[in-house]
Amino acid sequence: MGPDSPLACTSMISLRHLTKRFGSQTAVHDLSFDIAAGEIVGFLGPNGAGKTTTLKMLTGVLEPSAGTATICGFDLLTSPMDVKRSIGYVPESGAVYESLSGLEYLEMIGALYGIAPAVARPRIEQFISFFDLSMDTLRSKLLGGYSKGMRRKVVITAALLHNPPVVFFDEPLEGLDANASVGFKTLIQTLAKEGKAIVYSSHILDVVERVCDRVIIIDKGKLLVDGAPDELVAEHNSGTLEKLFTDLTGGRELEARAEAFAKTFLP
């Protein structure tokens, strides 16, 4: 199946008892949920909760210790190449080949996905225009010399270049300026309207509350809540998603410790 072949499926992402262990430590424990076409799902949790480990399993970077998962009907273990063709992934690290120019990197990504140069170049130019990048800079400057924001824009372009039906974003706004952030939020909402499944992992909870129509919160590798942000906030009498998050994940205790610590600086 080519990178532009339509993938007709309702449940884009399906997890059943997905588990990941590192030695005696269980990083992700028995996660089960489904994500449908057109959903933007905020995947939330404190540091060390298992979010990135889960995303790495779903994108084929890590192998699960137990359980199963499918991406658009393709099993992670038995159809890994079909899974990779079906997803776009913007990792938190945003690692790139620093010895390539931005254009060389994007053309390489297009070739890896089997996109003909005559098709890849116009797509790249569309993203360059959207992100207000310079073609001269992309062509002549190595990625190692790019700012963090420019590098992030290139990584996002690479993730979307093959038009995947499922996209995973891990802290996607990191390094983007205010204007680019606004444009990016509009972009993912438009992608969802086109039927793509978007998984959005971020610590910027007010953005998640505005952009996502569903949130999944995990802690210590276990699922805590799953539902529409406004419904979860109302159900727990939290007022905001941020307060719900801190109530569920022990953030109130950390706030109290921070206040006590700050008082030690008072004369």
Model-derived features: positions:
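Residue-level preference for well-ordered alpha-helical positions
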Residues: G110, I128, V233-A234, T246
